[in-house]
Swiss-Prot record:
The organism of origin for this protein: Vibrio cholerae serotype O1 (strain ATCC 39315 / El Tor Inaba N16961)
Alphabetically ordered keywords of this record: Ribonucleoprotein, Ribosomal protein, RNA-binding, rRNA-binding
Disulfide bridge map: none
Record keyword Ribosomal protein present: yes
Quaternary structure and partners: Part of the 30S ribosomal subunit. Forms a bridge to the 50S subunit in the 70S ribosome, contacting the 23S rRNA.
UniProt cross-references to HAMAP family, sorted A to Z: Ribosomal_uS15_B
PANTHER family with a match to the protein in the record: RIBOSOMAL PROTEIN S15, BACTERIAL AND ORGANELLAR, SMALL RIBOSOMAL SUBUNIT PROTEIN US15M
Domain of life of the organism encoding this protein: Bacteria
Pfam families for this protein: Ribosomal_S15
UniProt family annotation: Belongs to the universal ribosomal protein uS15 family.
Gene Ontology CC terms, in alphabetical order: cytosolic small ribosomal subunit
Protein name, per record: Small ribosomal subunit protein uS15
Xref: NCBIfam families: S15_bact
Length: 89
């Protein structure tokens, strides 16, 4: 259910703030968003997979906390990220 290494590397390269950046909130949120989108397709085919649904809810919660942190830290970076990811906030 996880993303492969090439997909992760592409996401990190796109959202990184500098060359070796893998831990900034933008990168973490982008990786979580990709994983969430991947899992949503899984749940269309496997509606009864409640164990994975719990993992999905944990990812959504973690992304929400990171978004709240980024919003409080730097509003312009937050708004730019929301626009780039296509999130509805």
């Amino acid at each position: 259910m996880s993303l492969n290494a090439e997909t992760k590397a592409a996401i990190v390269a796109e959202y990184a703030r500098c060359e070796n950046d893998t831990g900034s909130p933008e990168v973490q949120i982008a990786l979580l968003t990709a994983s969430i989108n991947h899992l949503q397709g899984h749940f269309q085919a496997h509606k009864g997979d409640h164990h994975s649904r719990r993992g999905l809810l944990r990812m959504v919660s973690s992304r929400r906390k990171l978004l709240d942190y980024l919003k409080g830290k730097d509003l312009s970076r937050y708004q730019d990220l929301i626009k780039r990811l296509g999130l509805r906030r």
